[in-house]
């Protein structure tokens, strides 16, 4: 019988994760049509003929909303494992999570007061 230890599973996982993208790119290169021309080098805009410049300046408000979203998305990533193991972690972990949430609330209040969340 073939039995793997914990590290051997990790090695197999890393090998498979390395080979899958290589195989996908190789299959794409082999199966893709080999047409060359100006149409292939043009930009793609939702199936429509491109118009105007491809490089435009975005309003800074988009970046502010994206930054606030990323901050609270990362908060979710950190708090989910804590919530899953909450009953085993004890009071110290609860206090640490409250401090973490308080720091994020202070950041949210700061962004709100500075007008980063208002579009007008």
Swiss-Prot record:
NDH-1 shuttles electrons from an unknown electron donor, via FMN and iron-sulfur (Fe-S) centers, to quinones in the respiratory and/or the photosynthetic chain. The immediate electron acceptor for the enzyme in this species is believed to be plastoquinone. Couples the redox reaction to proton translocation, and thus conserves the redox energy in a proton gradient. Cyanobacterial NDH-1 also plays a role in inorganic carbon-concentration. It catalyses: a plastoquinone + NADH + (n+1) H(+)(in) = a plastoquinol + NAD(+) + n H(+)(out); a plastoquinone + NADPH + (n+1) H(+)(in) = a plastoquinol + NADP(+) + n H(+)(out). This is NAD(P)H-quinone oxidoreductase subunit 3. The gene is ndhC. It is a multi-pass membrane protein. It comes from Synechococcus sp. (strain JA-2-3B'a(2-13)). Its main location: membrane. The chain crosses the membrane at residues 10-30, 64-84, 89-109. Belongs to the complex I subunit 3 family. PANTHER family: NADH-UBIQUINONE OXIDOREDUCTASE CHAIN 3 (PTHR11058:SF9). Its EC number is 7.1.1.-. The keyword Transmembrane applies. Keywords: Membrane, NAD, NADP, Plastoquinone, Quinone, Thylakoid, Translocase, Transmembrane, Transmembrane helix, Transport. HAMAP family: NDH1_NuoA.
């Amino acid at each position: 019988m073939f039995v793997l230890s914990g590290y051997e599973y990790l090695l197999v996982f890393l090998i498979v994760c390395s080979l899958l993208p290589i195989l996908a790119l190789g299959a794409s290169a082999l199966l893709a049509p080999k047409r060359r021309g100006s149409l292939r080098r043009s930009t793609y805009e939702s199936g429509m003929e491109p118009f105007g410049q491809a490089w435009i300046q975005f309003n800074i408000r988009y970046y502010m909303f994206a930054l606030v979203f990323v901050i609270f998305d990362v908060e979710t990533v950190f708090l989910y494992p804590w919530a899953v193991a909450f009953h085993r972690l004890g009071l110290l972990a609860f206090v640490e999570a409250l401090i973490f949430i308080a720091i994020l609330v202070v950041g949210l209040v700061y962004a709100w007061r500075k007008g980063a969340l208002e579009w007008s």
